[in-house]
């Protein structure tokens, strides 16, 4: 894999291995390769709701991993992945604006189709190692995940993972924040659909 996510002081919360204190399910889902959408599909019927698509600046901990300037314009896509109608993951994808009109232009036309359709069907796409972190209030991802709960009380912390995809040398970063309903499902039903465990 050619692209490595780099770390500096602002990115200290992102780790190559999950933090101590993560449950076994959390460690598993934070480090699973392949398509998260495909993994969720084993639990039930997956739907994608787009909550935002816009040109915006990157979050404070994103530019270094994308080799970009702190205020460089980016194309941002935010979605909620639900299983059987219940939100399980809040996802934030970001690519340099030029890349969203070039190598990653198809991400602008996905609508409610999962980004995984682009990332795992093209042999020219490479993926970095996954990194993960605990997300608490103050990080923009916490606000995104809390909003996805649709009024339910947010936990003190979420866990999230992140990786960079490259296509023809242009980056696209995907950050996926797991929501409490995912962990409740795994506790009750294991790694399969409701009623299977």
Curated annotation (Swiss-Prot):
Keyword Cytoplasm appears in the UniProt entry: yes
Organismal lineage: Bacteria, Pseudomonadati, Pseudomonadota, Betaproteobacteria, Burkholderiales
EC number: 4.1.3.40
GO biological process: pyruvate biosynthetic process; ubiquinone biosynthetic process
Residues binding substrate, per UniProt: 77, 115, 176
Listed name of the protein: Probable chorismate pyruvate-lyase
Localization per Swiss-Prot or TrEMBL: Cytoplasm
GO-annotated cellular components: cytosol
Pathway recorded for this protein: Cofactor biosynthesis; ubiquinone biosynthesis
Family: Belongs to the UbiC family.
SUPFAM superfamilies associated with the record: Chorismate lyase-like (SSF64288)
Catalytic activity: chorismate = 4-hydroxybenzoate + pyruvate
Domain of life: Bacteria
Pfam (any one): Chor_lyase
Keywords: Cytoplasm, Lyase, Pyruvate, Ubiquinone biosynthesis
Function as written in the Swiss-Prot or TrEMBL entry: Removes the pyruvyl group from chorismate, with concomitant aromatization of the ring, to provide 4-hydroxybenzoate (4HB) for the ubiquinone pathway.
Any one GO molecular function term: chorismate lyase activity
């Amino acid at each position: 894999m050619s692209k490595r996510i780099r770390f500096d002081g602002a990115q200290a919360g992102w780790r190559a291995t999950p933090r101590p204190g993560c449950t076994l399910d959390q460690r598993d889902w934070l480090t699973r390769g392949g398509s998260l959408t495909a993994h969720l599909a084993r639990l039930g019927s997956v739907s994608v709701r787009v909550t935002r698509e816009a040109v915006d600046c990157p979050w404070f901990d994103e530019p270094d991993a994308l080799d970009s300037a702190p205020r460089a314009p980016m194309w941002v896509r935010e979605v909620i992945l639900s299983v059987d109608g219940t939100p399980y993951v809040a996802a934030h994808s970001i690519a340099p604006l030029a890349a969203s009109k070039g190598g990653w232009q198809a991400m602008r036309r996905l609508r409610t189709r999962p980004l995984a359709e682009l990332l795992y069907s093209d042999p020219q796409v490479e993926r970095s190692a996954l990194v993960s972190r605990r997300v608490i209030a103050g990080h923009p991802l916490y606000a995104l995940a809390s909003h996805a709960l649709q009024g339910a009380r947010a936990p003190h912390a979420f866990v999230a993972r992140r990786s960079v995809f490259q296509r023809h040398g242009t980056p696209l970063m995907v950050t996926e924040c797991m929501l409490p309903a995912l962990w409740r499902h795994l506790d009750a039903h294991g790694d399969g659909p409701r009623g299977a465990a």
